[in-house]
C-alpha cells in the first residue's frame, strides 16, 4: 500500500464542492483509496459524506493510501489545487 501526504489548498478545506470533486475523482478512478488526518483512522475516500465528516480545513495535512501510485499522484495534484477558485 502506497501513501502520500498532502496539504489541502482549497480555501474552505474539504467541504461541499471540494469534497464532492475529490470523492468523484476517487470513484471515477476505480481504485480503492483512503483518506485521513495523520495519526488518525482513515476512511473510504469515495464517500463525500465521510470526507466532509473529517472536518479537514485549509492548510491541514491529510494522508492518502492506495495500491495505485498513479491515482495517488492525480489525487495529490487535485488536493494541491484551490478547488473553490475554479
What are these regions (language model features)?
Residues 52-86:
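C-terminal structural segments of small proteins and small subunits
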Residues 1-5, 61:
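Intrinsic-disorder/low-complexity, polar/charged segments enriched in Ser/Thr/Lys/Arg/Asp/Glu/Gln
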Residues 4-7, 66:
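Long, low-complexity, intrinsically disordered polar/charged segments
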Residues 7-56:
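Compact, glycine-rich, soluble single-domain proteins
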Amino acid at each position: 500500500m502506497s501513501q502520500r501526504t498532502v496539504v489541502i489548498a482549497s480555501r474552505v478545506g474539504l467541504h461541499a464542492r471540494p469534497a464532492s470533486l475529490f470523492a468523484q475523482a476517487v470513484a471515477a478512478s476505480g481504485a480503492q483509496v483512503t483518506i485521513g488526518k495523520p495519526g488518525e483512522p482513515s476512511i473510504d475516500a469515495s464517500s463525500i459524506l465521510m470526507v466532509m465528516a473529517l472536518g479537514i480545513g485549509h492548510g491541514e495535512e491529510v494522508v492518502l493510501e492506495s495500491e495505485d501510485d498513479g491515482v495517488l499522484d492525480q489525487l495529490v495534484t487535485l488536493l494541491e489545487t484551490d478547488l473553490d477558485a475554479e
